[in-house]
Amino acid sequence: MNLVFLWAALGGALGSSLRYFVGKMMPSKFLMFESFPLGTFSVNLIGCFVIGLMGHLAAKKVFGDDFGIFFVTGVLGGFTTFSSYGLDTLKLLQKSQYIEAISYVLGTNILGLIGVAIGWFLAKNFV
């Protein structure tokens, strides 16, 4: 078996466990909101910050590929995929691909929300 898959799987298990833990530790009341997904919100922001650090370190070859697979793909992938979304957007902006970046941001948010709504509708009405 290729160890790359093992590293990604182990990191994913750790990241998913961390996401669950952070979600359980956060209150549901936040600022003026009676019910706010603070756990998910926090995980996404933490993941974006950490992938920014790791993305730069990876570009500078501070750590090896196996650790990158374990931590970036595995841990952060299990913790939040929003962090990858943030990194992909930043890379487009750094390459001055502004139309692509705007399309990616708007498309991901709008089509993602539509996908959630369609899935919800189908599950509600047909399952």
UniProtKB/Swiss-Prot annotation:
This is Fluoride-specific ion channel FluC. Na(+) binds at G77, T80. Na(+) is not transported, but it plays an essential structural role and its presence is essential for fluoride channel function. GO terms for molecular function: fluoride channel activity; metal ion binding. It catalyses: fluoride(in) = fluoride(out). It is found in: Cell inner membrane. GO terms for biological process: cellular detoxification of fluoride. The keyword Manganese does not apply. The gene is fluC. It comes from Helicobacter acinonychis (strain Sheeba). Belongs to the fluoride channel Fluc/FEX (TC 1.A.43) family. The chain crosses the membrane at residues 3-23, 38-58, 67-87, 102-122.
